[in-house]
């Protein structure tokens, strides 16, 4: 049976583009895209994606091993499954992206960027998702796996897209079982892959940040054992593992820090970790005509990056929220 990651990195097409084993039918759609359907039927349709940023290799390796186990018959499949390796060209180059950040392009936002391989791929992925979920009566899920650029005080966390409906109890149970440290609830629509599948496909979706970006072959996948066990259980229809970590913390985005001037200043050191706590009154950022000081007793910073282009988000300010916010 073929190796999806090896084929994708080599830019090759499998000798056979569809097949089956005792448990499932599989179909290679195009580069980095594989669909699998269980023979006994299913109640869930699941998208598992990684590599939207090409240098975030650990989740790619994790998904590739899951695909191998399913194709080799070492693990049963109980859901209809679409596996997405998001940005093959950037994966081959070992870079986050080649031209522009694909995870800002979904929901048709690729039209706002100069044409590139990434805009074409984002458009292609939107079409593939639409076709995968078309006329699908089963419950829909999407887990988009990433690793972070910087260190994090809470190293494993999920980001839930903004939506007006309650978040899926089944999805939240999986995220709990995956031993995530925190969940962050977005307060506005965005261009992420998970927001697209939530808004346009009605899927229960989450972006998962699972450690730091490292080159292929040097990841310690044991660090990802909890999320791996949870995803394995989900695709195989097995009971979820019991949570072993401390209680999951819930945050919501209070404010996005938008860089409107080249004079924008973020008053944090370059090595400030995600989820660093900030005390009330602290001057966090300023630019001509605008400054932001911490408003609540405590706020937390996520994805600080003052080097972004004008008009883009240079960080997010979080406040802690009760779990009831999810329902």
Curated annotation (Swiss-Prot):
Any Pfam family from its record, for instance, is AstE_AspA_cat
**Active-site residues annotated for this sequence:** 209
Keywords annotated in UniProt? Arginine metabolism, Hydrolase, Metal-binding, Zinc
Please state the Enzyme Commission number of this protein: 3.5.1.96
Going by the record, the broad EC class of this enzyme is hydrolase
Q: Which InterPro entries match?
A: AspA/AstE_fam (IPR050178), AstE_AspA_cat (IPR055438), Aste_AspA_hybrid_dom (IPR007036), SuccinylGlu_desuccinylase (IPR016681)
Q: List the disulfide bonds.
A: none
Q: What is this protein called?
A: Succinylglutamate desuccinylase
User: Cofactor note from UniProt?
Assistant: Binds 1 zinc ion per subunit.
């Amino acid at each position: 049976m073929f190796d999806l990651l090896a084929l994708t990195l080599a830019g090759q097409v499998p000798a056979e583009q569809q097949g089956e084993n005792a448990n499932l039918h599989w179909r290679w759609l195009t580069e980095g895209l594989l669909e699998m359907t269980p023979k006994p039927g299913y109640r869930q349709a699941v998208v598992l994606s990684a590599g939207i940023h090409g240098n975030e290799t650990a989740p790619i390796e994790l998904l590739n091993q899951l695909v191998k186990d399913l194709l080799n018959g070492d693990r049963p499949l109980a859901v209809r499954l679409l596996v997405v390796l998001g940005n093959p060209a950037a994966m081959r180059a070992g870079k986050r992206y080649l031209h522009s950040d694909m995870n800002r392009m979904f929901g048709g936002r690729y039209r706002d960027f100069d044409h590139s391989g990434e805009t074409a791929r984002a458009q292609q992925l939107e079409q593939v998702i639409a076709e995968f979920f078309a006329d699908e009566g089963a419950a829909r899920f999407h887990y988009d796996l990433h690793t972070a650029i910087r260190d994090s005080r809470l190293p494993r966390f999920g980001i839930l897209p903004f939506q007006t409906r309650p978040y899926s109890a089944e999805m939240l149970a999986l995220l709990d079982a995956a031993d995530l440290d925190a969940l962050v609830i977005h307060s506005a629509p965005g261009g992420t892959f998970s927001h697209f599948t939530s808004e346009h496909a009605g899927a229960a979706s989450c972006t998962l940040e699972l450690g730091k970006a490292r080159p292929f072959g040097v990841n310690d996948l044991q660090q990802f054992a909890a999320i791996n066990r949870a995803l394995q259980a989900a695709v195989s229809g097995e009971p979820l593992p019991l949570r072993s970590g401390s209680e999951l913390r819930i945050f919501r985005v209070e404010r996005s820090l938008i860089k409107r001037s080249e004079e924008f200043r973020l008053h944090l050191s370059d090595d400030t970790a995600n989820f660093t706590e900030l005390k009330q009154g602290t001057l966090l950022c300023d630019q001509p005509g605008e400054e932001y000081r911490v408003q609540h007793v405590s706020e937390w910073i996520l994805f600080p990056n003052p080097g972004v282009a004008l008009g883009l988000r240079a960080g997010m300010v979080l406040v802690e929220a009760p779990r009831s916010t999810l329902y």
